């Protein structure tokens, strides 16, 4: 591996990424940008982990400066640290504001742009901002359970913050304080663990006044810790699910006010409006699936949000809804507060999923992002009764654009963009003209050899067209032969677009000498809802044929010597299933966090709504409390409609479980690597161990790698490095001469 790493003294580090001669003193534990030197022109795991990660841009009130964060990683220290930067909207050199040894997050401008608020170490701070410098910091909160996220009211006189409260899951010290060293979890209901943690605590959001000394306690929006709902919703609580009204009198929020089994099987998340002054709450939406991300129009006369229609189906079309807000009319039987009516779907005639709605400054239209035909673009819609949606980024631009974080007076959109060739950067877009603002990793990416990417539309077995990206190694020569990697997408709903990943990094794969094949098979979300929905109840059907179509297409090329199939989560399921049916199509397999035994998976995963729908139930949530045993209809058990369960009598569910990958192990004969995180509660680690054990019992060359402290993803730097090295070691062993 031809890479040189140069260690730089702190005095030199202090000058990196700054646009002036000001010297800053790095704090203990500070990690700065990498000066990695690449001598062979190839992206490698070490190069990947050296990249700075740009995130959370915020436009200043005068629309002249962007505040953002960059995380840098130390493999040796096995950690990353995030610090703050600014850059002019017009571009130029960034200014580094902090050089801390502990990460800083959620930086926000004050309304006058003279103060910057931020989180560090679980508490909120502020510091004056003058002439490109941060002044002395002042601590604003001292919350015992810490502040996880926050949002200031428009005039910065009030604060809402997210912290943790005790859940229904019991620990020994709840009944006896003397047992404070005992470790056990007790529950009498579902949803006792989520993603990677036992649910001993859940998020609640509080409101407090700013400016009266250090905040030690606020008012719980939900009414108190005895209300065991999550606000924001887990497992990744996001303050974007709460929004201050422009006058600071109200907070719109999204919440799934359910617990236990009901929480586990339902996606019914509703929009509410809370009044901090009176403590009263008005419910805006009542039924259906996820309602999230409320945003007020600038004058407060309208409220927009994202919505799914069907309860229990997390891959339903994401609609952009808007309603008119009335402050002088309250429905009978509801608490005093504004009423929202004339609710309409602005995207009814739009075939894609809306994301990240942002109001235009004049309140006459909304911007949003959407994955459309394999790339993510920015769109605009005027909220009239017959809305017209206009795409603002050209569909032939091979980038993924995020939703705008700022709109300038001339209509220029400030946003983020990525591609398979570079990670997140800040960019300005106007009439399809793109002006890149940040170049965080240009000094590293410029050292890499160039490669080519091709978009192929392949004919599927049922005569449809499937977008398949193909990446070729640098200096590709069609007269030579190369091994190929087919990526099996997780989800199963998602899209192989022009996004950037720090694990499934396609640029690195092609730089390691592989042709990389990315089929947007049935179930992907950027090609309309029918293409997405087809996969539900048909995991072993058309999408598997789509994989085989793409594999055979690339294998027929004279420059391809063999094909490996690799994937995570549902992609791991795909690998395990393909291993039992492919015959001689594939030469090697890698599965990370894959589903192996669908019956076991149904009874050990946490978010039950997903398998209950996708495994063949295809029905909305229904529950009758107090019922036990079979309901007599073949799909209701314990009062819960469970058409996607192993005990369902629905034909699609029966077919699903009859074709679980573990039942096809007798056909396995191809080398397989199984990797899994020990803290993965979405697809428990037993799935990976069972697949490996089965491969061993069949005499199939196989390897198991378990990361005890990792979840569904591999996040710690040294673990990530080992994961990548193991990935390529296995591929090279079986795919290269």
Annotate each PLM feature:
Residues 16-17:
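C-terminal motif of bacterial Sec signal peptides marking the signal peptidase cleavage site
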Residues 24-31, 35, 81-82, 164-224, ...:
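Predominantly five- to eight-bladed beta-propeller fold
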Residues 51-66, 101-116, 144-159, 192-205, ...:
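Conserved beta-propeller blade repeats
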Residues 56-58, 160-162, 185-186, 191-210, ...:
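Non-catalytic accessory segments flanking enzyme active sites
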Residues 88-92, 128-133, 210-213, 275-279, ...:
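Short loop/turn segments that connect beta-strands within beta-propeller blades
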Residues 440-562, 568-569, 603:
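Cap/lid segment of the alpha/beta-hydrolase catalytic domain
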Residues 510, 518-737:
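Active-site-proximal cap/loop segments of hydrolase catalytic domains
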């Amino acid at each position: 591996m031809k890479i040189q790493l140069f260690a730089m003294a702190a005095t030199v580090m202090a000058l990196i990424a700054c646009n002036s001669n000001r010297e800053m003193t790095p704090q203990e534990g500070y990690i700065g940008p990498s000066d990695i030197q690449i001598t062979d022109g190839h992206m490698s795991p070490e190069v990947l982990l050296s990249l700075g990660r740009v995130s959370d841009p915020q436009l200043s009130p005068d629309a002249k400066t962007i505040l953002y964060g960059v995380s840098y990683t130390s493999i040796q220290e096995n950690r990353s640290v995030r610090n703050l930067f600014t850059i002019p909207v017009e571009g130029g050199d960034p200014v580094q504001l902090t050089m801390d040894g502990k990460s800083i997050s959620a930086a926000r401008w004050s309304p006058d742009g003279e103060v910057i608020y931020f989180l560090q170490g679980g508490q909120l701070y502020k510091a004056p901002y003058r002439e490109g410098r941060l002044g002395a910091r002042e601590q604003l909160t001292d919350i015992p359970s810490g502040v996880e996220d926050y949002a200031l009211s428009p005039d910065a006189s009030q604060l809402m913050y997210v912290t943790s409260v005790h859940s229904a899951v019991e620990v020994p010290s709840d009944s006896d304080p003397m047992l404070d060293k005992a470790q056990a979890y007790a529950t009498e209901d579902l949803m006792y663990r989520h993603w990677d943690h036992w649910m001993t605590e859940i998020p609640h959001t509080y409101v407090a006044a700013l400016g009266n000394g250090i905040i030690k306690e606020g008012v719980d929006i939900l009414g108190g810790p005895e209300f065991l709902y999550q606000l924001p919703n887990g497992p990744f609580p996001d303050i974007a699910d709460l929004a201050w009204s422009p006058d600071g009198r109200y907070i719109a929020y999204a919440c799934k006010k359910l617990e236990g089994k009901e929480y586990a099987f339902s996606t019914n998340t509703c929009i509410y409006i809370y009044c901090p002054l009176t403590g009263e709450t008005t419910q805006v939406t009542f039924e259906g699936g996820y309602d999230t991300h409320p945003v007020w129009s600038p004058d407060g006369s309208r409220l927009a949000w994202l919505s799914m229609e069907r309860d229990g189906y997390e891959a339903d079309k994401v609609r952009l809804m808007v309603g008119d807000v009335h402050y002088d009319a309250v429905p009978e039987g509801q608490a005093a507060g504004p009423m929202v009516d004339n609710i309409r779907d602005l995207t009814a005639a739009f075939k894609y999923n809306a994301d990240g709605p942002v109001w235009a400054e004049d309140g006459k239209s909304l911007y949003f992002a959407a994955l459309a035909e394999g790339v993510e673009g920015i769109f605009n819609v005027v909220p009239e009764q017959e809305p017209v949606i206009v795409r603002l980024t050209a569909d032939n631009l091979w980038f993924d654009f995020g939703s705008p974080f700022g709109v300038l007076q001339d209509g220029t959109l400030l946003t983020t963009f990525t591609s398979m060739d570079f990670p997140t950067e800040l960019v300005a877009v106007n009439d399809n003209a793109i002006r890149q603002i940040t170049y965080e990793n240009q000094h590293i990416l410029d050292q890499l050899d160039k490669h080519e990417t091709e978009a192929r539309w392949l004919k599927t077995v049922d005569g449809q067209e499937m977008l398949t990206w193909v990446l070729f190694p640098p200096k590709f020569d069609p007269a030579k032969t190369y091994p190929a990697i087919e990526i099996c997408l997780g989800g199963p709903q998602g899209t192989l677009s022009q996004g950037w990943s720090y694990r499934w990094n396609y640029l690195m794969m092609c730089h390691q000498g592989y042709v990389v094949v990315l089929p947007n098979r049935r179930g992907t979300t950027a090609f309309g809802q029918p293409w997405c929905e087809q996969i539900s109840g048909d995991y072993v059907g058309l999408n598997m044929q789509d994989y085989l179509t793409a594999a055979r297409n690339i294998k027929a090329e004279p420059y391809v010597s063999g094909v490996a199939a690799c994937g995570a989560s549902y992609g791991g399921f795909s690998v395990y299933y393909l291993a039992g049916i492919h015959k001689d199509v594939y030469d090697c397999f890698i599965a990370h966090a894959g589903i192996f035994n669908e019956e076991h998976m149904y009874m050990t995963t946490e978010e039950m709504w997903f398998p209950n729908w996708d495994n063949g139930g295809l029905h909305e949530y229904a529950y009758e409390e107090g019922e036990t045993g079979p309901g007599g209809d073949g799909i209701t058990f314990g009062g819960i409609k469970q058409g996607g369960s192993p005990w369902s009598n629905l034909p699609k569910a029966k077919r699903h479980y009859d074709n679980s990958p573990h039942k096809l192990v007798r056909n396995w004969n191809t080398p397989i690597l199984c990797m899994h995180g020990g803290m993965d509660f979405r697809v428990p680690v037993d799935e990976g161990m069972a697949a490996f054990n089965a491969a061993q019992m069949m005499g199939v060359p196989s390897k198991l790698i378990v990361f005890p402290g990792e979840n569904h993803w591999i996040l710690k730097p040294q673990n990530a490095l080992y994961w990548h090295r193991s990935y390529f070691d296995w591929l090279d062993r079986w795919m290269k001469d």
